[in-house]
Regions:
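Conserved glycine-rich cofactor-binding loop
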Residues: 6-7
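Conserved glycine-rich Rossmann-like NAD(P)H-binding loop of the short-chain dehydrogenase/reductase
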Residues: 20-36
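Conserved NAD(P)H cofactor-binding loop of Rossmann-fold oxidoreductase domains
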Residues: 77-82
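Substrate-binding pocket helix/loop in short-chain dehydrogenase/reductase
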Residues: 85-86, 90-98
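Active-site helix of classical SDR
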Residues: 109, 150
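Residue(s) in the substrate-gating loop at a strand-loop-helix junction
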Residues: 134
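SDR active-site lid
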Residues: 164-225
Length: 259
């Protein structure tokens, strides 16, 4: 079950899962995009249309997904981004972004666990719950304060659940892409990445890395270099990352003014 499948990363993950023999349920709010994705996918695929921010839709989606047999993989890929100076961020945007990126995935994960525990077969097959986060769930970055807060929260939530459920058949994992070429990005973000020389991945490359991650025993995965290094350094010597970002701050703020 892949949420946010009408988006770039979610759609690419759904597609590669289908190519690897999974029966995939694709969730989203855009019927047209989901229909186009289904046509492009190989293997079995079913559309689950609904808004995860609505409790009735979440319940209906899970009932349909579990109708015939238990679901052994949930990928929460639905999300929003925001590149805005914090003082210019409207309260409505903060609420919407935190709801979509953190609170709704928490609620849907809770409901998925309950459904999985009820419907799980006698073999107790391993279940994977993967939250699609971001490298900005490890590194606070100017202009993305609200987005970073949501992804930091999602990572902490995943880490806590992984430990809480370590004696069960459910594994909780966090997958963190870096900058990726998708429609979620504002034009100013794309232009800033070019100006700073930041690497930007295709959704296909991200999906391939996701598949490798899924087939591994890793609990967390940061996509790309030097982001992996920056994450490690930020954990031990954050001042070095402070200095690196400080040297780029004038450029970042120039593009913030355009957002």
């Amino acid at each position: 079950l892949v949420t946010g499948a009408s988006g770039g990363i979610g759609g690419a993950i759904a597609k590669i899962l289908g190519e690897n023999g999974y029966h995939v349920f694709i969730q989203g709010r855009n019927q047209k995009k989901l229909a186009q994705l289904k046509i492009s996918m190989s293997g079995n695929c079913e559309i689950l249309l609904g808004d995860l921010n609505k409790s009735d839709d979440r319940a209906n989606i899970l009932n349909l997904a579990f109708a015939n047999k238990p679901v052994d993989l949930l990928v929460n890929a639905a999300g929003l981004s925001s590149f805005v100076a914090f003082e210019d961020t409207k309260p409505e945007m903060i609420n919407e972004l935190m709801q979509t990126n953190l609170i709704t995935p928490m609620l849907f994960t809770q409901e998925f666990i309950a459904k999985s525990n009820t419907e799980q077969n006698a073999e107790q097959k391993q279940v994977n719950v993967v939250q699609v986060g971001s490298a900005f769930g490890y590194i606070g970055y100017p202009g993305f304060s609200t987005y970073c807060a949501s992804k930091f929260g999602l990572r902490g939530f995943t880490e806590a659940l992984a430990r809480e459920y370590s004696d069960t058949n459910i594994r909780f994992r966090y997958f963190a892409p870096r900058a990726t070429s998708t429609s979620i990005n504002a034009v100013s973000v794309d232009e800033m990445n070019k100006a700073l020389g930041n690497a930007v991945d295709t959704v296909e490359a991200v999906a391939k890395t996701f598949m490798d991650f899924l087939n591994s025993k890793k609990r967390q995965q940061v996509v790309g270099w030097p982001e992996k290094l920056f994450v490690r350094i930020n954990g031990f010597i954050p001042k070095l990352v402070d200095n690196a970002i400080q040297s780029k701050l004038a450029v970042i703020k120039r593009y913030l003014q355009q957002s």
